[in-house]
Amino acid sequence: MKRLLSWLTGALLMAGLLAGLILPGSVHADEDLVGKYSGNEIRNIADDKIAAREGKVDLNNSSVRRFQQFPGMYPTMAGKIVLGGPYNDVDEVLNLDLSERQIELFNKYKENFTVTPPEIALNEGDDRINDGQYR
């Protein structure tokens, strides 16, 4: 009886695995058809945010690494800015506990920053502190 049960269990498992290999091609919807018939364009949130910031660093959705282009801001001040958000306005950064030197640096580069609404896809976990890009 044990042998029959183990044989049936194995056969059922193999049938399930084979079905899993065969079905995905017919189960998944074609992305072109989804976009065409749903009336919605398939969009990537990250690409939308990059387009919205117009070459500037988004204080609510950028990682610490984006501040490397501004001498003196990376990593200490950049970390404070990233952890201090979200912001409604660029000037809200001045409400953080910044030294006089850091305030001068921020004002020097202020025109290079923008604020857009925080997006969970870009802020989930600790990706803004360590986005996993290594040299």
Swiss-Prot record:
Cited NCBIfam families: PRK02515.1
Keyword tags: Electron transport, Membrane, Photosynthesis, Photosystem II, Signal, Thylakoid, Transport
GO biological process: photosynthesis; photosystem II stabilization
Lipid bilayer topology: Peripheral membrane protein
Localization annotation: Cellular thylakoid membrane
Assembly behavior: PSII is composed of 1 copy each of membrane proteins PsbA, PsbB, PsbC, PsbD, PsbE, PsbF, PsbH, PsbI, PsbJ, PsbK, PsbL, PsbM, PsbT, PsbX, PsbY, Psb30/Ycf12, peripheral proteins PsbO, CyanoQ (PsbQ), PsbU, PsbV and a large number of cofactors. It forms dimeric complexes.
Signal peptide residue numbers: 1-29
Originating species: Parasynechococcus marenigrum (strain WH8102)
Function, as annotated: One of the extrinsic, lumenal subunits of photosystem II (PSII). PSII is a light-driven water plastoquinone oxidoreductase, using light energy to abstract electrons from H(2)O, generating a proton gradient subsequently used for ATP formation. The extrinsic proteins stabilize the structure of photosystem II oxygen-evolving complex (OEC), the ion environment of oxygen evolution and protect the OEC against heat-induced inactivation.
SUPFAM superfamilies for this protein: PsbU/PolX domain-like (SSF81585)
InterPro entries xref list: PSII_PsbU (IPR010527)
GO cellular component, one term: photosystem II oxygen evolving complex
Record-given protein name: Photosystem II extrinsic protein U
